[in-house]
């Protein structure tokens, strides 16, 4: 999976298209990511001893990894490629050529 936790990304599809934010969690088994402030859903919580009234909580839902592009240090969004630098495999931005790792 080309996106990692902590990467700054731009959403390229969906209702939050154009938003730039940080990846909170990567879910490689299902090829999805949770991005801060993107795809907000309302989750109903049952009443419990901590919250006897119950609640409606807003949280981020996972979005497919193909709907985001990783930003480099200069804020250029592009596809991610892999190459070897000094015998170490690193990710790089294919548009700008800048190393991401």
UniProtKB/Swiss-Prot annotation:
Disulfide connectivity?
A: none
Q: Name one GO molecular function term.
A: structural constituent of ribosome
Give the top-rank taxon of the lineage listed in the UniProt record for this protein. Bacteria
Q: Does the keyword rRNA-binding feature in the UniProt annotation?
A: yes
Entry function: One of two assembly initiator proteins, it binds directly to the 5'-end of the 23S rRNA, where it nucleates assembly of the 50S subunit. One of the proteins that surrounds the polypeptide exit tunnel on the outside of the subunit.
Query: HAMAP family, alphabetically?
Result: Ribosomal_uL24_B
Under the subunit heading, UniProt states:
Part of the 50S ribosomal subunit.
The protein's name in its UniProt record: Large ribosomal subunit protein uL24
